UniProtKB/Swiss-Prot annotation:
The gene is ubiE. S-adenosyl-L-methionine binds at residues 69, 90, 116-117. PROSITE patterns: SAM_MT_UBIE, UBIE_1. One of its GO terms (biological process) is menaquinone biosynthetic process. InterPro entries: SAM-dependent_MTases_sf, UbiE/COQ5_MeTrFase, UbiE/COQ5_MeTrFase_CS. Transmembrane segments: none annotated. GO terms for molecular function: 2-methoxy-6-polyprenyl-1,4-benzoquinol methyltransferase activity; demethylmenaquinone methyltransferase activity. This is Ubiquinone/menaquinone biosynthesis C-methyltransferase UbiE. Its EC number is 2.1.1.163, 2.1.1.201. It comes from Paraburkholderia xenovorans (strain LB400). The keyword S-adenosyl-L-methionine applies. It catalyses: a 2-demethylmenaquinol + S-adenosyl-L-methionine = a menaquinol + S-adenosyl-L-homocysteine + H(+); a 2-methoxy-6-(all-trans-polyprenyl)benzene-1,4-diol + S-adenosyl-L-methionine = a 5-methoxy-2-methyl-3-(all-trans-polyprenyl)benzene-1,4-diol + S-adenosyl-L-homocysteine + H(+). Methyltransferase required for the conversion of demethylmenaquinol (DMKH2) to menaquinol (MKH2) and the conversion of 2-polyprenyl-6-methoxy-1,4-benzoquinol (DDMQH2) to 2-polyprenyl-3-methyl-6-methoxy-1,4-benzoquinol (DMQH2).
Amino acid sequence: MSKTHFGFQSVDEQDKAQKVAGVFHSVAANYDLMNDLMSGGLHRAWKMFTIAQANVRPGYKVLDIAGGTGDLSKAFAKQAGETGEVWHTDINESMLRVGRDRLLDKGVITPALLCDAEKIPFPDNYFDVVTVAFGLRNMTHKDIALAEMRRVLKPAGRLLVLEFSKVWDPLKKVYDVYSFKVLPWLGEHFAKDAGSYQYLAESIRMHPDQETLKTMMEQAGLDGVKYYNLSAGVVALHVGTKY
């Protein structure tokens, strides 16, 4: 049976999805609060930059993969307007439910769908923009997921991947202390769940760095791939186009 990683652990591929699901079932209720605490609110700026780069126009069809609590979908729905189509999706039912309810509370009505990024249930050449924010690192077969995202893009459509990445070397020691000491402490004290935030830190370290992910996107068939380092490389936004 094939092995993969769950944080720093080596696990069977079929077990990873269940373990990741357990993490997000656990954190869903406190997800927005913990994002604010862990990033000092910076996650909002990272997402705003992604929204600006997506450049969604009226009438666009947009797929928000691993959409979580709906920050991107909310913005895209307003930009695409009544003539557009924005799908808020997540593989985790708890996260999708929290996101759907949050969007409805904000007066945003957009379809919500349980969706495995490795088996996207849409036809070829359907979307103008596909986004995945802080979700790719949790996927078992990132290459398959990236190829699927490209498949559902229209020609000239763009994929945007916002994800934790490799921090600049001068900050590495401080970042390690924050990741492996402070994050689990925050998880324990504010969400009663140190383990899920230990996994968060480990999953970030196991995720491909900026150049590796750029190569993976190119190998998936995307062109003109570039990336933007945000907050000294704590996060990177990769953008690629389907031609």
